[in-house]
Amino acid sequence: MNKTILAALAAMSMAVSGPALAASKKEDSCMHQAAVVAAVQQARLDRVKEREVPAAVKAKATWPESFNTAIPLVTSWVYEMKMRDVKKNDLSAAWKEMCLAQ
């Protein structure tokens, strides 16, 4: 699972951040990325079909529009997990921690 998280995190960081960010910008970026992860996790818990997740998540977005590009990537990552793992883990906290560690 960690390899999958790292690969997804790297791809998402490239998609949204571009050049190296200053510390505060990095924190903001990681916070928005974590919000995307939390929204996708909630969609999975609400049993939204995988193909309907992008529209459902974008409708409730609380982050800048540029972070919407990560929704398909995060969706596939969350939906390949077992439901018990999605239920018992705080995926957004794990994502944010790994993002800040980069």
Please place each PLM-identified region on the residue numbering.
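Positively charged n-region of N-terminal signal peptides that target proteins for export
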Residues: 1-4
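Cleaved targeting-peptide boundary
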Residues: 21-29
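Bacterial N-terminal signal peptides
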Residues: 7-15
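Compact alpha-helical subdomains of small soluble proteins
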Residues: 44, 48-102
